[in-house]
């Protein structure tokens, strides 16, 4: 049984009902409806920390979805799960894929920056100052682009950029 049919969470259930109504009235193909259903179930599983189930749903949605913009959000969410699981290399791959399809995705740019900043901190702790500088510069590049797209977001990143002279 699909997650959307067994969900006890009121907000998720409300979202599911509204999404089902929209899918019925909007002119979409059955394949697009299936892709959205898998995506929705993936989001629900992800919000409950059921990452393996979420990934299964996202991969199925990715298989069915043909629209590049919609695929970018599926790829972004897969990246989020890999970030949560500590697999930063894999997460970066999915964030980059999301940006290839949708260059105006500031949250992917931000998450890439966060990973590079984290790696910069690790390099600094290992006394690899040159590598840390390169990683921090890379993080700054991605944060500047994210901030350009969403100027009122990422306040901590803006402060870090100013404090480090990278803004």
UniProtKB/Swiss-Prot annotation:
Keyword flag Plastid: yes
Organism classification, top ranks? Eukaryota, Viridiplantae, Chlorophyta, core chlorophytes, Trebouxiophyceae
Q: How does it sit in the membrane?
A: Peripheral membrane protein
The domain of life for this entry's organism is Eukaryota
Source species, please?
Chlorella vulgaris (Green alga)
**Between which residues do disulfide bridges form?**
none
- Spell out the residue ranges that the record assigns to TPR repeats: 35-68, 72-105, 120-153
Q: Where is the signal peptide?
A: none
**Name of the molecule in the record:** Photosystem I assembly protein Ycf3
SUPFAM superfamilies reported in the protein's UniProt record: TPR-like (SSF48452)
GO biological process terms, alphabetically, are: photosynthesis
Instruction: One Pfam family, please name it.
Output: TPR_1
Subcellular localization: Plastid, Chloroplast thylakoid membrane
């Amino acid at each position: 049984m699909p997650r959307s049919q067994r969900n006890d969470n009121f907000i998720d259930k409300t979202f599911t009902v509204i999404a089902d109504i929209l899918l019925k009235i909007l002119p979409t193909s059955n394949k697009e409806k299936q892709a959205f259903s898998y995506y929705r179930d993936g989001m629900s599983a992800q919000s409950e920390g059921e990452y393996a189930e979420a990934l299964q749903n996202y991969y199925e949605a990715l298989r069915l979805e043909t629209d590049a913009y919609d695929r970018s959000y599926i790829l972004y969410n897969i990246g989020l799960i890999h970030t949560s699981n500590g697999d930063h290399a894999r997460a970066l791959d999915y964030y980059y894929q999301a940006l290839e399809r949708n260059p105006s995705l500031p949250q992917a740019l931000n998450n890439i920056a966060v990973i590079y900043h984290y790696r910069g901190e690790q390099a600094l702790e290992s006394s690899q100052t040159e590598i840390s500088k390169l990683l921090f510069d890379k993080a700054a590049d991605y944060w500047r682009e994210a901030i350009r797209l969403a100027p009122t977001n990422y306040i901590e990143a803006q402060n870090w950029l100013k404090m480090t002279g990278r803004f």
